[in-house]
């Protein structure tokens, strides 16, 4: 309190000195501001009669009219009262010369808001009228069923149904819904069509499983063939081929028929015989025929009557002349169309004129198909969907006008009850997306829908067929569902503002150093933040120039794995500085934690099976050699050996082999035995090799029939392999003994008491081997570390156990005074506070890390503003064994 009083006195003295300086320079004091209340002209009331008359013209019900006018009048009254109160208070601090401006602003604000509300009230009539029309249409559609039109069957999509029927005669419900949507018909119509088609079909009907898919290539090939067959029927009239007797084309006159037929030659008419229809000599030059159509029918009848075994099928088409270099010319005479029959005044050309032979050059096919026939084929192959089909070409867009400003939307709520609800956008389809069949996904390439040509997706033979693109709707509004309301609040915090507030807070805390007395004491969390800032080595002048990042992570140069949890709110980046200040103390517990070997059972089993396999192989070789010796003795005529003499060496050799197998792993083999090792010794040496985790060879794993354990997960501990399980590679197999271990890894004082199975460190644990980070709860419970252990490689965070305790291992802060004068400047503040101690178990060794704590056990630790940063040009973690790489650290 005394500090604040002194500060206030200093501020008062500074203000008085400034006033005296201003008066000395000739500054004039301003006139006193009047305190008398200011009265403004009353605001006009809204014109309710005009609004009532306009609402009555549109025949708004009296109840709705009264409710709208009452809400409008009450809103205007509340607005007048709010303006009077606020402007009366503002007028007390405004100069009398500017009161007219304040009055003008008050009147303008009132009139603008009242006019906006009047427009909203007049819109109630239009919304009510639209709602009434919608209800009338719904009532008429639901009650009057006699006038309801019968759904039309779109026969132009029958080929689609027939093509689907060829693949599957029993469509599922989802398939029927999709077919109905594509054809623009009802699902009931599709169901009835398939029922009738199955009843009329003969033979076995195809039936696919619900999860099967239609073969796309075959489906596209059949569709294209079907489209080509239907091409003449689907073409427009001006593109159809000209055929005589077509009912859709006008009858040809005599002059038009003469122009349509090729010119005839003036030669003698040939004699009509039975051979005329079969063969005509090359020298025959027929003249224009004068036979009428009935005589031609008689000739054709005589020619056909001679064939008793076959009946020729006649088709209505023009005469065709077959040309071949090795065979004589033949003329096929077909029956003329019915349109020509009975016309005797038309000259009929039996043989076309002889045209000199020319070597025609085949036109090159161009890749761009811009002809009308190709365009017609494209339109026939991919017809546009029916106008009755629900085709989603784009997302539905509502035509409702957007609000001009957010203030208008917020003012609508002041109108009270009676305002109409916001109309929901009309649904363009009722088929949910999850009901679409997986089988018809193969039919999604454009079958009955227009699509742009894409050579990669739809490789067809035309390029300018369609101009629109079909897309399946995936949003909820397209299927009639209301959009999900987002409950997430917008983030309105500003990074610049947060950084500014944080900088001023640090400046305020650091200014405590300059104060003479430190009473009253700071709260626990502010005290901890001040200690952290002092540890960082900042001063009040450096705080404003340093940029802070509250959400920074740990030093990425030294961290091998960051657990995927909530972002760490604080970091410790400058580990050497923290070590010099004795905030981190690496300590080894007297009782070293030794974890069991998880691979020992598998290694033992592999060794046993390898020895068993070696014994069987040796026995088989001995039996084979015995049979060979017996055969040689029999061939040489030597007497047979006694059974006792045969079995004794076998037993002794088997026993010796067992002894040798047991002793092979514990003794040194010579160079000669290394060049020619036995199978048992090879298996045992391979099984006991130090290649973790695959501690057995491929042959041992295959023979054992079991797999080795996988790499431990995040919740498991790293298996520590005993020292006796390691085999050093070299020219000889070396067994691990105490002398060799002491020579390689150094002597251990507790080796006699603990044993050789404990993990050994070749050198003392140094501070540059570990980096840690703190978590949000204040204790170092979730940490990341990088341990640089020799001969063991990199260790992951998944292989370590971390425990933390707050205030349990408080140490005497007097031991921390060796940090120098810089550290002793603030150690007296943190004398009575407990410490935060974290224990880290790394490869069997336990280390404790201490960081400043709090004098209140219940107060949570706040590390949100604690950041330790490295200098821009320095790299304090260059000696770390980093698997991620990189040297930059974001601060």
Swiss-Prot record:
Kindly report the protein's main subcellular placement as a broad class.
Answer: nucleus
- TM ranges are none
Question: Sorted alphabetically, which Gene3D superfamilies does this protein's record hold?
Answer: Homeodomain-like
Task: Tell me which residues form the DNA-binding region.
Answer: 146-205
Known CDD domains for this protein? homeodomain
In terms of superkingdom, the source organism counts as Eukaryota
Show the disulfide pairing: none
Q: Which Gene Ontology molecular function entries are recorded, alphabetically?
A: DNA binding; DNA-binding transcription factor activity, RNA polymerase II-specific
Which chain positions lie within coiled-coil regions?
Answer: none
The UniProt function text for this chain reads:
Specifies A-alpha-1 mating-type. May regulate the expression of genes specific to the homokaryotic cell type.
Q: What is this protein called?
A: Mating-type protein A-alpha Y1
Q: Which organism is it from?
A: Schizophyllum commune
Phylogenetic lineage: Eukaryota, Fungi, Dikarya, Basidiomycota, Agaricomycotina
């Amino acid at each position: 309190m005394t500090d604040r009083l002194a500060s206030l006195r200093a501020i008062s003295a500074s203000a008085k000195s400034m006033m005296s300086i201003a008066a000395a320079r000739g500054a004039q004091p301003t006139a006193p501001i009047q305190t008398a209340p200011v009265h403004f002209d009353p605001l006009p009331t809204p014109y309710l009669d005009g609004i009532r008359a306009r609402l009555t013209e549109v025949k708004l019900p009296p109840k709705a009219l009264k409710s709208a006018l009452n809400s409008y009048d009450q809103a205007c009254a509340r607005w007048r009262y709010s303006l009077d109160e606020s402007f009366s208070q503002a007028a007390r601090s405004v100069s009398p010369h500017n009161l007219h401006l304040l009055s003008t602003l008050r009147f303008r604000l009132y009139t603008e808001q009242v006019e906006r509300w009047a427009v909203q009230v007049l819109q109630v009539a239009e919304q009510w009228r639209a709602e009434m029309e919608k209800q009338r249409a719904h009532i008429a559609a639901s009650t009057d069923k006699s006038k309801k039109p019968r759904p039309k069957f779109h026969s132009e999509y029958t080929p689609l149904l027939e093509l689907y029927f060829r693949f599957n005669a029993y469509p599922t419900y989802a398939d029927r819904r999709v077919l109905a949507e594509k054809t623009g018909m009802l699902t009931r119509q599709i169901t009835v069509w398939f029922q009738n088609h199955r009843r009329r079909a003969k033979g076995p009907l195809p039936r696919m499983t619900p999860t099967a898919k239609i073969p796309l290539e075959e489906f596209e090939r059949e569709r294209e063939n079907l489209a080509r067959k239907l091409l003449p029927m689907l073409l427009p009239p001006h593109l159809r081929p000209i055929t005589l007797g077509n009912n859709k084309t006008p009858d040809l006159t005599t002059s038009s028929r003469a122009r349509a037929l090729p010119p005839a030659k003036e030669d003698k008419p040939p004699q009509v015989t039975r051979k005329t229809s079969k063969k005509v000599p090359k020298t025959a030059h027929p003249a224009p025929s004068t036979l009428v159509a009935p005589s031609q029918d008689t000739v054709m009848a005589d020619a056909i009557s001679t064939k008793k075994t076959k009946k020729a099928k006649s088709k209505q088409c023009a005469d065709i002349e077959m040309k071949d270099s090795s065979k004589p010319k033949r003329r096929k005479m077909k029956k003329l169309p019915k349109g020509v029959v009975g016309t005797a005044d038309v000259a009929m050309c039996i043989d076309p004129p002889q045209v000199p032979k020319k070597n025609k050059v085949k036109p090159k096919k161009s890749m761009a198909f811009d002809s009308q026939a190709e365009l017609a084929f494209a339109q026939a192959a991919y017809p546009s969907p029916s106008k009755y089909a629900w085709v989603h070409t784009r997302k539905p867009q509502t035509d409702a006008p957007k609000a001009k400003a957010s203030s208008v939307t917020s003012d609508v709520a002041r109108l009270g009850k009676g305002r109409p609800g916001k109309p929901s956008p009309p649904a363009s389809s009722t088929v949910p997306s999850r009901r679409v069949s997986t089988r018809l996904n193969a039919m999604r390439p454009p079958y009955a829908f227009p699509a742009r040509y894409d050579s990669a997706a739809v490789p067809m033979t035309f390029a300018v067929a369609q101009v629109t693109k079909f897309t399946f709707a995936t949003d909820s509004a397209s299927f009639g569902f209301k959009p999900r309301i987002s409950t997430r609040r917008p983030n309105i915090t500003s990074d610049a503002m947060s950084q500014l507030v944080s900088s001023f807070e640090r400046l305020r805390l650091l200014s405590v150093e300059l104060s003479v007395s430190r009473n009253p004491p700071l709260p626990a969390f502010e005290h901890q933040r001040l200690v952290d800032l002092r540890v960082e080595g900042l001063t009040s002048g450096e705080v404003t120039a340093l940029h802070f990042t509250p959400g920074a992570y740990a030093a990425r140069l030294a961290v091998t794995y960051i657990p995927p949890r909530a972002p760490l709110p604080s970091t410790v980046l400058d580990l050497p500085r923290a070590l010099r200040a004795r905030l981190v103390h690496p300590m080894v517990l007297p009782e070293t934690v030794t974890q069991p070997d998880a691979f020992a059972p598998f290694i033992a089993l592999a060794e046993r099976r390898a020895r068993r396999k070696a014994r069987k192989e040796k026995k088989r070789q001995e039996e084979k050699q015995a049979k060979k010796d017996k055969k040689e003795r029999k061939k040489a005529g030597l007497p047979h050996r006694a059974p006792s003499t045969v079995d004794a060496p076998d037993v002794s050799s088997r026993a010796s082999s067992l002894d040798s197998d047991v002793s092979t792993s514990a003794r040194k083999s010579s160079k000669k035995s290394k060049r020619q090792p036995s199978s048992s010794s090879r298996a045992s040496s391979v099984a006991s090799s130090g290649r973790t985790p695959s501690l057995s060879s491929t042959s041992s794993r295959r023979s054992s029939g079991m797999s080795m354990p996988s790499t431990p997960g995040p919740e498991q501990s790293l298996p520590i392999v005993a020292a006796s399980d390691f085999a050093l590679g070299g020219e000889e197999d070396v067994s691990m003994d105490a002398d060799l271990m002491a020579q390689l890894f150094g002597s251990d004082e507790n080796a006699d008491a603990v044993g050789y199975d404990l993990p050994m460190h070749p050198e003392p644990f140094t501070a540059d081997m570990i980096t840690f980070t703190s978590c949000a709860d204040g204790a170092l419970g979730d940490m990341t570390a990088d341990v640089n252990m020799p001969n063991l490689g990199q260790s992951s965070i998944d292989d370590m156990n971390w425990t933390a305790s707050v205030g349990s291992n408080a140490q005497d802060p007097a031991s921390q005074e060796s940090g120098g004068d810089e550290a002793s400047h603030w150690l007296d503040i943190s004398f009575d506070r407990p410490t935060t101690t974290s224990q880290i178990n790394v490869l069997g060794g336990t280390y404790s890390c201490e960081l400043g704590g709090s004098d209140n056990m219940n107060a949570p630790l706040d590390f949100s503003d604690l950041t330790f940063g490295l200098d821009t040009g320095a790299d304090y973690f260059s000696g770390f064994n980093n698997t991620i790489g990189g040297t930059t650290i974001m601060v």
